[in-house]
Amino acid sequence: AWVDWEDQILQDTVPLVNFVRMI
């Protein structure tokens, strides 16, 4: 359960970080 939760957070966070880096 924890692993799935972390994977879900990463999937939501990585695109956000990439978006911020573009700016």
UniProtKB/Swiss-Prot annotation:
Key word Cell wall biogenesis/degradation present: no
Species lineage: Eukaryota, Viridiplantae, Streptophyta, Embryophyta, Tracheophyta
Superkingdom field: Eukaryota
GO CC aspect terms: chloroplast
Subcellular location: Plastid, Chloroplast
Keyword line: Chloroplast, Plastid
Role description: Has a function in the early stage of chloroplast development and palisade cell morphogenesis.
Keyword Phosphoprotein (UniProt): no
Organism: Pseudotsuga menziesii
Main location: plastid
Listed name of the protein: Protein DCL, chloroplastic
